[in-house]
Amino acid sequence: MILPVFLYGQPVLRKEAEDVPKDYPDLKQLVANMFETMYNADGVGLAAPQVGLSIRLVVIDGDVMGDDFPECKGFKRALINPEFLERSEEEIAMEEGCLSLPGIHEKVSRSKTVRVRYWDENWEEHEEVVEGFAARIVQHECEHLTGHVFIDNVSAIRRQLNKGKLNSIIKGTVRCSYRAKAVGK
C-alpha cells in the first residue's frame, strides 16, 4: 500500500523518533509499504517519520544509483533502530534532495564512511561498514529519526534562498508526482 509522504512543516518530521519494539504490530507489512511508497516516489530511501510514524525505521534501496556509484549496487536494507558506531572524519559534499522537500536540492557534507548497527525486519542484528553514496543515503535517512531534515545542514543564506520553496511546501502548493501530506492541505 502506498502511504502519503509527509512534507516539510509536518510536526512528525521534527520529533525524535522512538525505538521500534520487537512486538511492533505488522512490522513486515509496514516495511513492505514503505518500500512501495519509496519506489512510487522514485526515492532511494524513506524514514518512518516521512510516512507519519515517529519510530526508528528506515528503508533504503540504492540499486538504481549503482551505475554511478558501485557501492549502491544491490544495497537494499530495512534498518530498525539504527545506531552509528563510527563516522569517518573525511567528508564529501554532494547535492541531496528529499521526498519531504520536493523541488529542493542542496549540497550537504557527510562522512565518507560509517559503521552502523541495526536490526532487519526479521530482527536479525547487523553491523556493517557503509561507504560512499550508500553511506550518504544511510546518514540522510537516519537523520530523519533525530528530528532533522537535510536543509538544516546548509548555510543560513542557502536556507533563506529556499524560503519561498519551503513556504510553498508548508502551504501544500508545491507540485508532487507522488501522494503527499502537507500542513496546509
Curated annotation (Swiss-Prot):
Biological process terms in GO annotation: co-translational protein modification; translation
Tell me the superkingdom of the source: Bacteria
Question: Which Pfam family, any one of them, does this sequence belong to?
Answer: Pep_deformylase
Active-site positions on this chain: 141
Enzyme class, first EC level, given as a word: hydrolase
What does the record note about the cofactor?
A: Binds 1 Fe(2+) ion.
State the needed cofactors, names only.
Fe(2+)
Please tell me where Fe cation binds in this chain: 98, 140, 144
UniProt-listed Enzyme Commission number(s): 3.5.1.88
Q: Which reaction does it catalyse?
A: N-terminal N-formyl-L-methionyl-[peptide] + H2O = N-terminal L-methionyl-[peptide] + formate
Q: Which GO terms describe its molecular function?
A: metal ion binding; peptide deformylase activity
Q: Which UniProt keywords apply?
A: Hydrolase, Iron, Metal-binding, Protein biosynthesis
Query: Does the keyword section mention Transmembrane helix?
Result: no
Note the InterPro entries from the entry: Peptide_deformylase, Peptide_deformylase_sf
Function noted in UniProt: Removes the formyl group from the N-terminal Met of newly synthesized proteins. Requires at least a dipeptide for an efficient rate of reaction. N-terminal L-methionine is a prerequisite for activity but the enzyme has broad specificity at other positions.
Q: Which family does it belong to?
A: Belongs to the polypeptide deformylase family.
Protein's recorded name? Peptide deformylase
- Look up and give the organism this protein is from: Parabacteroides distasonis (strain ATCC 8503 / DSM 20701 / CIP 104284 / JCM 5825 / NCTC 11152)
